[in-house]
């Protein structure tokens, strides 16, 4: 794929300012709408990655934009020392939809890696230390998540990893 000089200049700035976890990106995206994204040159693409599974509603969905805008106008984020009505209502909805047994609770995470780490901690709380991981899968970049990841190139630089996988 050929990119414009303007896009190439941005990619060079990226290279100079980022750690290349995924290597050099192929495009510099400027905006999105629904399932489509546009690069800084105005070229339109179908977003087949969905933000690697985090943009299930697509880009710029009006109801999502309205909900985010409303919440940002009230409180953007609070630490775990506090809570909000929205957090309580979201947790109650998850428990209701999951038909969770009485006494169940919710722990909201910032990322998939944090969710994996939490699952490891919860399983260890039972006294069981063995972990079953999905072969061929990527589980995240934290030490615990890398311990479950199949690809040796991701694992080797951080060994020794968690035992019992």
Go through each PLM region and give its residues.
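PLP-dependent aminotransferase-class I/II
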Residues: 32, 136-165
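Active-site-adjacent loop/helix segments that line or gate small-molecule/cofactor pockets in enzymes
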Residues: 1-33, 87
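Solvent-exposed alpha-helices and their adjacent loops that cap or buttress functional pockets
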Residues: 28-30, 97-101, 124-125, 157-161
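Short beta-strand-to-turn element immediately C-terminal to the catalytic PLP-Schiff-base lysine
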Residues: 38-39, 57-59, 147-148
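Fold-independent oxyanion-binding glycine-rich loops
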Residues: 17, 40, 48, 111-112, ...
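Active-site and channel-lining beta-strand-loop segments
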Residues: 26-48
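Glycine-rich loop-to-alpha-helix module at the N-terminal edge of alpha/beta enzyme cores
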Residues: 3, 44-132, 140
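A non-catalytic, amphipathic alpha-helix used as a structural packing/dimerization or gating element
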Residues: 9, 13, 67-70, 89, ...
């Amino acid at each position: 794929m050929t990119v414009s000089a303007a896009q190439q200049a941005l990619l060079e700035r990226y290279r100079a300012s980022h750690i290349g976890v995924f290597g050099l990106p192929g495009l510099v995206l400027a905006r999105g709408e629904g399932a489509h994204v546009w690069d800084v040159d105005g070229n339109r693409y179908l977003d087949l990655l969905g933000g690697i599974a985090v943009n299930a509603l697509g880009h710029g969905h009006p109801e999502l934009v309205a909900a985010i805008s409303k919440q940002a106008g009230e409180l953007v984020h609070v630490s775990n020392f506090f809570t909000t009505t929205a957090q309580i209502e979201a947790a109650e909805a998850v428990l209701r939809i999951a038909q969770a047994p009485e006494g169940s609770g919710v722990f909201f995470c910032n990322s998939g890696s944090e969710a994996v780490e939490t699952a490891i901690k919860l399983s260890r709380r039972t006294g069981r230390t063995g972990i079953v991981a999905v072969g061929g899968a990527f589980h995240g970049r934290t030490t615990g998540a890398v311990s479950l990841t199949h690809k040796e190139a991701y694992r080797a630089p951080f060994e020794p990893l968690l035992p019992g996988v």
